[in-house]
Design a protein with these regions (language model features):
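Functionally critical, mid-to-C-terminal surface segments that flank or help form catalytic/ligand
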Residues: 145-192
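Generic beta-strand/beta-sheet core signal
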Residues: 101, 150-152, 199, 206
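Sterically constrained small-residue positions within well-ordered secondary structures
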Residues: 15, 140-143, 168-169, 187, ...
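Compact, glycine-rich, soluble single-domain proteins
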Residues: 173, 183-185, 189-214
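Active-site loop/helix belt of alpha/beta enzymes
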Residues: 6-7, 11-21, 28-148, 155-156
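Conserved beta-strand segments that form the floor/walls of ligand-binding pockets within enzyme
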Residues: 23-25, 58, 99, 177-179, ...
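A glycine-rich helix N-cap at a beta->alpha junction
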Residues: 1-5
Length: 214
């Protein structure tokens, strides 16, 4: 996504006697990494294409709002991408593999699939958002996380649970502690919202998820 990176790859590839096969990242609206869709970027990519032992195999962008019902921004990103491809080909730079579709656009925008797609969250059986179609793919969660209860205690009504006491018991309650937290990648956003399955019965997550337990 920058000339300096390609130049470094070229030097390494030459030293190893191999070709570095790369894909160019184009930033059409995500505003993270990638070349901006400008004529100046075309100049840089033309220079990259001439570097020794560099083979440009693909060029891609990433949609910022494809999981929203309103696809206006996504269509605009696609327009910028297509325009940039036209500019490259006017310079006789033909890149064989073109890809733009993430999970949401795989579902809702089948005309954007081009040469390949990049399935992300749908690979795990989850929909990107509540706003995408549920009719195209019948998704089911493909992963589960198993652990053990490490401690059980009873607390009286009116007791606050975990950090900041965001959950307060309204009756005498049995509390189980599970040794998983946000340090393990378990989303803290599930605090007082998520559920766990214990011997076939759902139990609510109460209180704030900690670094290593909830």
């Amino acid at each position: 996504f920058c000339y300096e990176m390609a130049e470094s790859l070229s030097k390494i590839a030459q030293a190893l006697g191999k070709d570095a096969k790369i894909h160019i990242k184009l930033d059409t609206g995500m505003n993270r990494i990638g070349f901006k869709p400008t004529k100046e970027s075309v100049d840089i990519i033309e220079k990259i294409a001439k570097l020794p032992n560099i083979k440009i195999q693909g060029i891609f962008t990433h949609f910022a709002c494809a999981d929203e019902a309103d696809k206006t921004e996504t269509y605009e990103q696609e327009r910028k991408y297509d325009q940039f491809i036209t500019w490259l080909e006017e310079r006789d730079i033909y890149i064989p593999i073109k890809h733009v579709s993430n999970s949401a656009s795989i579902i809702d925008l089948d005309g954007f699939r081009k040469d390949m797609v990049r399935s992300g969250i749908i690979t795990y059986g989850l929909y990107p958002s509540e706003e995408v179609s549920k009719d195209v793919l019948d998704l089911r969660p493909a992963m589960e996380l198993k652990t053990h209860i490490v401690y059980i205690k009873e607390v009286e009504a009116g007791e606050g649970i975990s950090y900041n006491h965001t959950y307060v018991t309204d009756k005498k309650t049995k509390i189980a502690t599970i040794p998983v937290g946000y340090a393990d990648g378990y989303p803290r956003s599930l605090s007082s919202k998520g559920k766990v399955l214990i011997r076939g019965q759902y139990a609510p997550i109460i209180g704030r998820i900690c670094m290593d337990q909830f």
